[in-house]
Each structure stands twice: as structure tokens, then as C-alpha cells.
Regions:
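Conserved beta-strand/loop scaffold segments within soluble protein domains that form the structured core
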Residues: 1-139, 149-154
Length: 154
């Protein structure tokens, strides 16, 4: 299976198009957005399945720091002729600070009737229990947050 990982760590706007045009084509795509610097980070990912029996998995993980705005949109499009296709879209954004703004918008457009396609999305702050646990092991708050962020983006 073809695997692609792309990282974004500067403000900007990106569009990624993933065409699935060959019968049985398989691909995994992962996008990592490190938006700990202020600015606007916008990512759109579109997977278009036009061949039968294709398999995909799209994952976006983002960290949104204070003063940053992250907008992630993902779309899985499955054409009528792309029967027996499977794809999963996952968008996860971790917010750091009260001024971090983030949105995750997963979408499915399915014209075929023999497919497996789904999505998941979440936007939220660092889990306070995880922070307290790491701090009880001797880490300072900033170091604990950094440890959680590194694990989340890995």
C-alpha cells in the first residue's frame, strides 16, 4: 500500500487531491499540521474514487496554538462506477490555549451502492487528566503539554 505523509508548519492554504483511478489501487495519506505559531492554516483534502475496488485511508492531525486558526476540510468522493471501494477519513485537532480556533469538516459524497466509507472528527483541548498524570511524574506543565503534543502528532 502506498503511504504518503505531509507536514505543514507555516501558515498557509493547501489543497491535496488524491485520485484513485486504477482498479484495486490502495493508498494511505497522512497530513500533520503544527500550528503552534500564530496565523491561518487551511487544508483541504479530496479523495476521488473512480475505479472499482480501491482502498484509502486519510488522516489529518493538527495542533492549534494560541493565536492560530486551523480549518481542515476532508472529502471522500466515490463515483457510481467505483463499486467495492473502502475509505476512511479521520480529522483530529488538538487546541492549545483559549485563543486557538479550529474547525474540522469531514464530508462523504457516495454515488456507488457497494462501498464502505466513513469519517470521524474531533476538536478539543489537551486532556487535563493526562496533564496531571505527567505532572505527578515530575514534568512541569509546559513540558507535559509538549510531551502530549509530540505523542499526538507522531
Amino acid at each position: 500500500m502506498k503511504q504518503i505523509i505531509q507536514k505543514y508548519d507555516q501558515p498557509g492554504t493547501w489543497e491535496v487531491v488524491l485520485p484513485f483511478t486504477k482498479v484495486g489501487q490502495e493508498q494511505t495519506w497522512t497530513g500533520i499540521i503544527d500550528a503552534r505559531q500564530p496565523g491561518v492554516y487551511e487544508l483541504t483534502v479530496v479523495a476521488t474514487h473512480t475505479a472499482q475496488g480501491t482502498r484509502g485511508r486519510i488522516t489529518v492531525r493538527a495542533v492549534c496554538g494560541a493565536g492560530a486558526r486551523v480549518a481542515v476540510r476532508g472529502l471522500i468522493r466515490i463515483a457510481k462506477e467505483a463499486q467495492d471501494t473502502e475509505d476512511f477519513l479521520e480529522l483530529r485537532i488538538l487546541t492549545l490555549g483559549k485563543t486557538a480556533l479550529a474547525t474540522a469538516e469531514p464530508e462523504l459524497e457516495i454515488e456507488a451502492n457497494q462501498v464502505k466509507a466513513s469519517h470521524a472528527a474531533s476538536v478539543g483541548p489537551v486532556d487535563e487528566e493526562q496533564l496531571l498524570y505527567l505532572m505527578s511524574r515530575g514534568l512541569g506543565r509546559a513540558e507535559a503539554v509538549d510531551t502530549i503534543v509530540r505523542g499526538f502528532l507522531a
